[in-house]
Amino acid sequence: GSWSTSFGMSILLVRVPKELRKEDNVQDKTQQQIQELIGRMETVFATMGSVKAENGIVAWVLGRKDLMAFEIVVHKDKISFYVTISKKLRQFIEEQIHAQYPNAQIEDVSDYNIFAPTSVILGSYVVFKRADYFPIKTYRKLETDSMNSLTNALSKIDSGDGASIQYVLRAAHKHWRRDGLMIAKGMQQGKRLSDVERQGLLGLIWYVMRGLGAIITEHNKDKTPGGNTYHLSPLENDMIKGLEEKASKAGLEANIRVVVSAKTPEKAQRYLNDILNSYCQFNIYEYGNSLTKKMPMLQTRMIRHFIFRRFDESFSLILSAEEMASMFHLPLPSTETPKINWLLSRKALPPPNLPSEGILLGLSEYRGHKYEVRMKSGDRRRHMYVIGKSGVGKSVFQASMIKQDIEAGRGVCVIDPHGDLIDECLEYVPKERADDVILFDPADFERPLGL
């Protein structure tokens, strides 16, 4: 990514309601329900990974513009979920999220700032120990919500401090699958993993395409009574299955950054270690891949990349959609982690039979679309109550209706015990209607009102 791609981005706050059905409390159903809900986010990432990766001289010089950032942030004592996306891809991402999370609310917000003027800032990348094609453990193999450990670590951050887990993503080029499939194919032909890796890709392709595996195996069986074909262990068979499963999924190039801000160096180091240790649950130590921290020497460069959401090739890794969904998904209804920024009230789609004429009451915004809400004149003859506590906009709402009536030439009667609303309404009266105004002022002792 380049500096130019860091600007012109939309920062979206995504919130979901906490709704737990009674039947979801049954333990046998909970695990299945967890996997189904996390699977929704896998579908979102799979769609993103299926987009053709940008390439060519323009992408190389100016940087790829198909970057997306998914972030879990502790800011102002709340754990919030953000998506940062270019305006070009915004509608596409919103549609994908709403398709899987119909009750999610996505709203534009200004960028957050977890840093304080005197805070201590630490950051680290999370990278693979082995090649990208080796898989890690995903939510399908975990008994609990894979993100509970991450959000629990974030919930321990004190008020006034902050932290962010940032995933900067872009679609991976399709050739990333090739190496993993070649490794799996070589092991299926009776070779050890170490032998396949030592042989190298070119030799392996030649070996597979010429079908020499079967010839060599038969020759060795004739030569030696017991044969010398290597027999795979059950765990090695699982490894082959994992390699093939990862290669069958949509792939995303990722930078995983963890940045913390605290009042003291000791607290900052503790916060960082707690978050990084939460990634151990995804490790498959011997027959798969592991995640490890990689703290750059130039912390200022990393923090700058974090702020501008830049992609750094030197710390990249390739995750399948399933692996990415295991590390980032919207909070589940069963999540009990404190400080989650839940959606407390949902927005509903306006009814399709909204009147197209009448006085304008306001605008209803739903999933990026604005709808005019109007009231017909016949309905206004009924009693209407405007209820709400001080400061929520009752007088402003009434003043808007009064202004529309005055501008339309209709008659208006306003009784205001305070007088502020009357003063505001008088400003709406045009010169040509000045003679239409009758003002009853109880404070005018020269013209007392008879009650």
Predicted regions and their residues:
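Structured core elements
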Residues: 13-15, 80-82, 166-168, 257-259, ...
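N-terminal pre-Walker A segment at the start of P-loop NTPase domains
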Residues: 352-373
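Short acidic/polar alpha-helix capping motifs at helix-coil junctions
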Residues: 56-61, 363-367, 389-390
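Switch/coupling segment of Walker-type NTPase motor domains
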Residues: 373-374, 379-451
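Active-site-adjacent structural elements in folded domains
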Residues: 238-244, 368-372, 392, 397
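Extended, folded cores of ATP/NTP-driven motor/assembly subunits in large transport
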Residues: 1-351, 445-451
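Short, mixed-charge, low-aromatic patches
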Residues: 47-54, 226-232, 354-359, 379-383, ...
